[in-house]
Amino acid sequence: YLYAIDVDKKPRNNTRKAVCKNSTHANSYAIHVDQKPRNDTRKAACKSPKNAHRYAMLVDSKPRGDTRKAACKSPYYAYRYAILIDQKSRKDTRKAVCKSPYYAYWYAKEVDMCPHEETRKAACKDSLYAYLYTKEIDKCFREDTWMTVKGTEYEEKYKRILKKLVKEQII
């Protein structure tokens, strides 16, 4: 892509074809040389979750099914896609983030902004995120989160937060 910038000083089919063999180079070509979306550079960018996300943000400037599908191969990029590009929750991005307790918790907190069975189930794969899910999202006792934190370093914190939540409800 540097050849297109430094020598050709314009987009050409032969340089574009060459850069489309690498998702990062295709992304950079679309941003710096074509300066617009094209099906061939988008297809090449979608070989990588990172570059699909980057293409949607910087080239398409909007959500698309193909870039979202590629981003959803990574919980991290699925989360980023939902929060920065879609700017809303969707079944496909939620499913992708649920491969990670960390991103499931953050998706529930920052994207769904409410409890969801799928994100809670994923958060319950790790005692820290089960505890945080109870504290920040559910804000009530649930058997599944309790069973995850029971017998761990978060058990006492879980009990304390539940006592606090009960006191707040009474007052």
Where are these regions (language model features)?
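Ankyrin repeat (ANK) tandem alpha-helical domains that serve as protein-protein interaction scaffolds
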Residues: Y1-I171
